[in-house]
């Protein structure tokens, strides 16, 4: 499965509250999902939801459009995210209870592709000293909760800042485990903004990224990409990401981001009326995705799968387990205290109380948008 998607959080961090989140308003969902289809994507990433709201219609709309969701379990609201500098103050029952409510509710939608246990939590010296073992603890707790309470297995991963100091050592630490396999991520996302303007596979450094993760035992993809130093963005990296240069290592990616927010990465602008204006970036990305249909992706994927199988067989011959055991230490991050004991055992055993997600029949009205969509020049 190759992810071809966008990051989606209308309103940014203020787009979530007690009353709303990106999947709580069916009218907004219908408007944007029609545009997702025009863009030609198969996956969206959402950074935060409120599990006390109803998401059935929006998730049913996404499913009917053939679109998957990768969902972050944290939110900017109080007690609903890890404090990267003092994680021991936020790793508690209240925090884990909210995480499990998100997981429980969304595990009942079959188009939930995976959960991110964190996003760029390790991004400087202090967070690299204090947070890694707590991120691993949250990964473990979510995976244990899914094992005991979810109707199906769902992968759990992490989304990393593309910081050379921490990217590789932290990915290796999250990949490994000693005794409990739940401490190992199921996938790894990289937020990468290094391809700016006119670049190539080599001048952008994508060749180094592909080389860095060539032996990684978990699926890797871009959880964010799309440098905006040159506007409008041309998205020429799309061809490289889905080419034979990359598909052996990277499973696609998610463009940052759908709606225009203050940081100027938007593909569309939402007008005060709720109508939408497409931005030049939308048209450029659409063209790049359309051009992929001309590439013989299926034969490339088939040959890359054959190569991966051969590599896997070779590795199995040379070592007992392809799953790395944890090292005593990793450069630039502190893992010396070991993974904290879980505070979630009772919650995992009892389960949390939350409305379970379910697909609902959709009416003709729900499948159409009442909003207008304007071209970039009109």
What are the language-model segments listed below?
Residues 15-36, 95-103, 166-181, 234-241:
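Short, acidic/polar
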Residues 77-101:
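Active-site-adjacent "subsite" loops/lids of carbohydrate-active enzymes
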Residues 33-37, 56-70, 102-111, 176-183, ...:
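Acidic (Asp/Glu)-rich catalytic clusters
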Residues 1-65, 100:
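Active-site-adjacent substrate/metal-binding segments within catalytic domains
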Residues 231-353, 358:
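Substrate-binding cleft of secreted/luminal carbohydrate-active enzymes
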Residues 99-130, 157:
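Active-site groove signature of glycoside hydrolases
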Residues 127-243:
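Noncatalytic carbohydrate-binding groove/subsite architecture in carbohydrate-active enzymes
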Residues 3-6, 42-46, 69-73, 113-117, ...:
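Hydrophobic faces of well-ordered beta-strands that scaffold small-molecule active sites
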């Amino acid at each position: 499965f190759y992810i071809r998607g966008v990051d989606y959080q209308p309103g940014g961090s203020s787009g979530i509250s007690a009353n709303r989140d990106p999947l709580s308003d069916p009218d907004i969902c219908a408007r944007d999902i029609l545009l997702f289809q025009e863009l030609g994507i198969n996956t969206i990433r959402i950074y935060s939801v409120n599990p006390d709201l109803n998401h059935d219609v929006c998730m049913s709309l996404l499913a009917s459009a053939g679109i998957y969701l990768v969902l972050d379990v944290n939110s900017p609201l109080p007690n609903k995210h890890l404090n990267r500098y003092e994680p021991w103050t936020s790793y508690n029952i209240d925090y884990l209870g909210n995480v499990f409510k998100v997981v429980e509710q969304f595990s009942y939608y079959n188009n939930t592709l995976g959960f991110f246990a964190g996003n760029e939590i390790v991004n400087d010296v202090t967070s690299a000293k204090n947070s890694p073992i707590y991120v691993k603890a949250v990964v473990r707790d979510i995976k244990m909760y899914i094992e005991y309470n979810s109707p199906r297995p769902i992968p759990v991963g992490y989304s990393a800042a593309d910081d050379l100091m921490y990217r590789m050592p932290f990915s290796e630490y999250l990949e490994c485990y000693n005794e409990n396999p739940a401490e190992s991520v199921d996938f790894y996302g990289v937020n990468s903004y290094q391809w700016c303007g006119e670049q190539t596979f080599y001048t952008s450094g994508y060749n180094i990224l592909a080389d860095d993760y060539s032996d990684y035992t978990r699926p890797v993809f871009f959880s964010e990409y799309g440098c905006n130093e040159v506007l409008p963005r041309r998205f020429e990296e799309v061809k490289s990401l889905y080419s034979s240069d990359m598909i052996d290592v990277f499973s696609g990616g998610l463009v940052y981001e759908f709606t225009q927010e203050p940081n100027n990465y938007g593909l569309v602008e939402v007008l005060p009326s709720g109508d939408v204006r497409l931005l030049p970036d939308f048209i450029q990305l659409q063209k790049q995705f359309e051009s992929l249909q001309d590439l013989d992706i299926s034969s490339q994927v088939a040959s890359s799968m054959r190569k991966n199988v051969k590599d896997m067989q070779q590795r199995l011959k040379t070592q007992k387990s392809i799953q790395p055991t944890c090292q005593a230490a990793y450069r630039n991050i502190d893992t010396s205290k070991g993974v904290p004991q879980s505070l979630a055992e009772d919650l995992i055993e009892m389960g949390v109380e939350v409305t379970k997600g379910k697909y609902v029949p959709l009416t003709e009205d729900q499948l159409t948008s009442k909003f207008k969509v304007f071209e970039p020049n009109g």
